[in-house]
Each structure stands twice: as C-alpha cells, then as structure tokens.
Amino acid sequence: MSKKEISFTEGPVFQSLLRFAIPVLGALILQAAYGAVDLLIVGKFGNASSISAVGTGSSFMQMATFIITSLAMGSTVIIGHHIGEQKPKEAGNAVGTTIILFLIIAVIMTFVLEFAAGGIAHLLQAPAESFDKTILYIRICSAGIVIIIAYNVISGVLRGVGNANLPLLFVGIACVVNILGDLLLVGVFHMDVAGAAIATVFAQFVSVVCSVVVLRKQDMPIEFSREQCRIYKKELGKILNVGVPIALQETTVQISFLVVNSVINQMGLMPSAGYGIAQKIVSFIMLVPSSVMQSVSAFVAQNIGAGKKSRAWKGFYTAIITGCSVGIIIFMVGFFGGGVLSSFFTNDSEVIAQSAAYLKGFSADCILTCVLFSSIGYFNGCGKSIPVMIQGITSAFCIRIPVSIIMSRLPETSLTYVGMATPITTVYGIIFFAICFRLLNKNAAK
C-alpha cells in the first residue's frame, strides 16, 4: 500500500483516523464552499426571490447528491473489506461493478429530474415569487447529474482504499472553478440563478476530467483493468446490501429536510430566504460530524475485514471524543455568531435575522451529531446498514417532520423553534443506536 493510501489496520488509532479525517474534512469544506458560493454571490447581486430559489433548489440537489453518496458508501465499505482481506482482484471487481451501476443510475436520474423539475418545485412549495427560478435551477443542475455522480463515485472508491488526499485535490479544483464561474456569470453577465447553476455543473465537470487524468497515473492497492468494467453479481449483491439501506436512510432524512423546507416556505418569503441562508451555514457546521462518519466507516471496514474488531471499537470511541471536542466550539460559533455568519451571504437585515434565529435552535446538534454519525459510521463499516436505515426512517417520519410542523404552528413561533427539531431528532437517534450496540454486544457474547 502506497503512502497515499492509509492502512487502518496498524499503527496508532488516533493518528490513522486524523490523517484520513483531515483531508476528508478539507474536501467537505471545499464541497460546501462551492455550494455556498452560489448563494453568496446570488445574494449579493440578486434579490430575496433569487436567494429563495437557490436555497430551495440546492436543497433538493443536495438531497440527490447525498443519496448518491450514501449508495456509493456500499462501494467504499466493500472495497475496504477487500483491502483489509488483502484481496486486490476482488477490490478491482467491486470498482468495475460500481462504475457500470452508477452509469445506469446517472442516465435514469437525468431524464427523471429534467421532466419532474416543475413538480419538485411544487412539492417544495417554493414561494410564488421564486417558483420559476427554482425550476430553472433544478433543471440546469439535473442536466449535470452525470457529472455529480461521477465525482462522488470516484471519491467513494478512493476512500475505500484509504486515499482521502485526491478527493481533496479534485474538490479544490471544482471550488476554484465555481467561484470564478459565479463571479463571471452572476456578477458580470447578471445571469442570476441560471448562472449559479451553470457554474456549479461546469466546475464539477472540470473536476471529474482532472480526476480521470490523475487516476490513470496512480498506483493503488487494487487490481483493476477496463475489462473489469462490468457487473459482477457477487460484488453487486454486496454493494447493494450495504448501499441500498444507507441510501434509503439518507433519502428519508433528506426528504424530511425538504418537508421542513416546505413548512418554512409556507411561513413566507423572508423565512424561506433566511432558512436558505441558514442551511448553507449548516452545511459547513455539519462537516466535522460528516468527516467523522466517513472516517469511521473506512476505518471499521478495513479492520473488520482484517478481523480486528477490538481495534474497530477503539477507532469508534476515539472518533466520538475527537468529534465532540470540536463540536463544542462549533456550537458556540453557531449559537452566538449566527447573525455575523449570515451577513456574509446577504445584506438584507430581515433575512439575516431569520437565518440567525434558525441557527440558535439548531446549533446544539453540532455536538450531538458527532455521537450519532460515529455510530452510523461504525454500523456502515461493519456492513450492518439495516439498523442505520431503520433509524433514518423512524427519525425522519416519526420525529423530525412532526416536531417541525408542531413548532411552526406554535403561537408567535419563529425559526428558532423549527430549528430545535433537528437536535431533538438526533437525541432519538443516539438512544436508538445505544440500544443497537447493547444488542450487538449481547449477541457477540453468546
């Protein structure tokens, strides 16, 4: 295994996780940055309807991207298992299966999303002032879904072999291109929402092209050739057994957030615009838990494959302690500095106030989610994704959506109350996995 690929099965646990998590976090920061740049530049050069359109449209595209990333986690885990088992040919077969599988998914999603853009905007209850712009944003981004999928599949494969540095490089390229594209299309040519969407798709296209060029020159701990680009039924079954439950879990979670978006849209244009700003800030706030989850999944996958269960447990606990320590700091920033953070995206004082209100209610989740995401990462890495799916479905439909609706209908309600629905949901998730861990240990002791 080359120096660029990290072996999680040997060496100090904390250092191994940290070496992997830092570039993962860096990639997530840059990925969130080029998503936030759209809203930031549109907010500076456009109006509230444009902010609402990009906020609502990007929420849906974020959902689609998360689903793809979650399904690709099946590939990450299976490749990690093969690496831990020292079976490079089987790892290559998993890569080939992944390429064909996601190519089929990309073609289907492109056609479906293009034709369904209007219905999606209606379901999201986009405000009348921003309805047409929301449709436009979704359609342009949907045209580039193949590119979005390609990037996430490449990143998933690289994480499976323990390489988090190249995804960081590729997303860095996309971020720079997107910033330049937004400034040109939105700031100079005044293309508003359309310019932001075009810049995002083009940026990822450039990133994918660069990734293909770089990967052709890389040595990785797998045996892979073009002839392996086909469906291997055995590998497909393994990938889907892990990836589908994770994707279903993520789908329900993202649908629940879209429902929350819809609930807030009914509160008016300003709350809708404020929530759009807040969600972009949240996308940054949640990067630490997300990097922890991806790191734990890769760490556990390799160690389970190598038969080192005690080391997998040690990595899990180390990730929780590290993540929560950073989460406390992020909580303070989100709770007390929400207004300052929101002002980077817009000059509208009312939109800033609405965004800051939501962040106050939400910010406790910065700490809680580090525990939840570490648990999800552990079960994903073990290949036990059914509990993850059950937790996601029940938390979305039994907790987050009902609590959000109730909070939005309280007398003299505000986005602070709606924002509290997320940490309340996370507490449920932590309790759920505490029970699952107890059952897992009980069965292992028999």
What are these regions (language model features)?
Residues 1-21, 79-146, 188-244, 300-365, ...:
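Short alpha-helical transmembrane segments in multi-pass integral membrane proteins
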Residues 8-40, 44-45, 59-74, 78, ...:
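N-terminal transmembrane alpha-helices
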Residues 19-38, 140, 174, 203-207, ...:
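Transmembrane helical elements of multi-pass membrane transporters/channels
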Residues 29, 33-52, 121-128, 184-191, ...:
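Helix-terminus/linker motif at the lipid-water interface of multi-pass membrane proteins
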Residues 31, 35-42, 65-72, 76, ...:
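Alpha-helical transmembrane segments and their lipid-water interface positions
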Residues 51-111, 148-167, 274-338, 369-391:
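Small-residue-rich hydrophobic transmembrane alpha-helices
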Residues 141-159, 167-175, 196-211, 290-293, ...:
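Short runs within selected transmembrane alpha-helices of multi-pass transporters and secretion channels
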